[in-house]
Amino acid sequence: RTIRQMGDFDVICLQEVAVNFPGLPGSRGEDQVAELSAGLPGHTVIYGAATDVPDGRGGRSQFGNAIFSRLPVGQAWRHLLPWPADPDVPSMQRVLVEAVVTADVGALRVMTTHLEYYSLRQREIQVDAIRHLHAEACAMSGRAPLAEEQGGAFEVFPRPAEAILCGDMNFPATAPARSQILAPF
């Protein structure tokens, strides 16, 4: 309801989306992906769970990010971000969800993530990983598909260099990590 009150969006990027996770503050264990999908008819959902653990009752509890798109969605990826050990702070696995959407201006990659909060070291490594993923996508955008990549699991779909990164970066605008993620290649 809140999203609809804010406006009529073609693409919505969300973080901290839970499925069957009653242990989270404010959660009843609901399937937030299903509830959001029901409230956003006509949108394709791309969900990426960073955390996927047993719920203790024979099911699974998941926590991650989601992209909801009213625009046509091509290929989608769910990239687990690095999670190196940092014994001095609590931390959790993080994910970047990426989808190619077709807008009036052409194909565009939309990415959403939620970087580590407590560990500066992990967050900096995650920023490096996102930059690496973007560089990889830019390289793929200029590559012509091979004949063997037509149809089936090897099919190469358009993956444009143009991208928008959304999310909870867990750093202020003045942080070095912001300059790091925005630095030109």
Region spans (language model):
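Active-site regions of metal-assisted phosphoester/phosphodiester hydrolases
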Residues: R1-V11, R28, T44, G48-F185
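Active-site phosphate/pyrophosphate- and oxyanion-stabilizing loops and adjacent acidic/basic residues
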Residues: A34-E35, S179
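Membrane-embedded segments
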Residues: N20-Q32
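Short, conserved active-site loops that position catalytic residues or coordinate cofactors/metal ions
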Residues: G7-F21
